[in-house]
Amino acid sequence: ATLSLVGKALKQINNPKAHLLFISLDPNRDNNLSNTNEWLRYFYPKADALIAKDEKTLQKITKQYNVQYQKIDLNDSFMGYSIAHSNMLYLIDEKGHFYKEISDLNPQEILRELRIFLNSQ
């Protein structure tokens, strides 16, 4: 749901500088970068995935951005497990500097925060 909301907001703003970066919390399933990027671009054309090469790298990335996640076994499901995670949007400038964390993910707030951020760049 978050990707859909962010993608809609970015399309509405239509700022050429806007780029969506998705950090996968499940490198075992999201192990094909090309397929994951194709899926992401359904939500926003200028989107790319970051997929950690191993659990240690993933832990480093999630610690840096204070992302909480947990693998939950689903014994009665064909999927086998699910990943529960915090739901945040991080605004990062072109130089990779952290700008702001957005935890209120209602559509109006996302749109407002993205406009403020993109206009400040």
Predicted features and spans:
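Structural microenvironment flanking redox-active thiols in thiol-disulfide oxidoreductases
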Residues: A1-I61
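Detector for Asparagine
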Residues: N14-N15, N28-N37, N66, N75, ...
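Thiol/disulfide oxidoreductase modules built on the thioredoxin-like
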Residues: T57-E113
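Non-globular targeting/processing and membrane-anchoring segments
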Residues: R112-Q121
